[in-house]
UniProtKB/Swiss-Prot annotation:
Location of this chain's protein in the cell: Plastid, Chloroplast
Keyword Chloroplast: yes
Keyword Cell wall biogenesis/degradation part of the UniProt annotation: no
Superkingdom field: Eukaryota
Organism per entry: Anthoceros angustus
Pfam families, A to Z: Ribosomal_L32p
One annotated GO biological process: translation
Protein name listed in UniProt: Large ribosomal subunit protein bL32c
GO molecular function, one term: structural constituent of ribosome
Record family assignment: Belongs to the bacterial ribosomal protein bL32 family.
Keywords: Chloroplast, Plastid, Ribonucleoprotein, Ribosomal protein
GO (cellular component) term, any one: large ribosomal subunit
Main location per the UniProt record: plastid
Length: 69
C-alpha cells in the first residue's frame, strides 16, 4: 500500500529553489557572454554559419527595382 511521503520543510525547499536559480543564472550569463562575443566579431575559436538567405532576397528585389528606373 502506498504511503504518503513526509512533507519537505520550507528551508529545504528554499535551498533547492536557490540552487536551481543559480544554475539558471549561470547558464543565462554564459549564453549572453557568448552572444556578445559573436556579435562583437572578435571570436577566433568559435565557428558558426551565417544565414544570408533573407539579405540575398532583399538585395535582389532592390536591384530589380533599380533596373526598372
Amino acid at each position: 500500500m502506498a504511503v504518503p511521503k513526509k512533507r519537505t520543510s520550507k528551508s529545504k525547499r528554499k535551498i533547492r529553489k536557490t540552487v536551481w536559480r543559480e544554475k539558471a543564472n549561470k547558464a543565462a550569463k554564459k549564453a549572453f557572454s557568448l552572444a556578445r562575443l559573436i556579435l562583437s566579431g572578435r571570436s577566433k575559436s568559435f565557428c558558426y554559419t551565417v544565414n544570408n538567405k533573407s539579405s540575398e532576397s532583399s538585395e535582389s528585389t532592390s536591384i530589380d527595382e533599380s533596373d526598372d528606373s
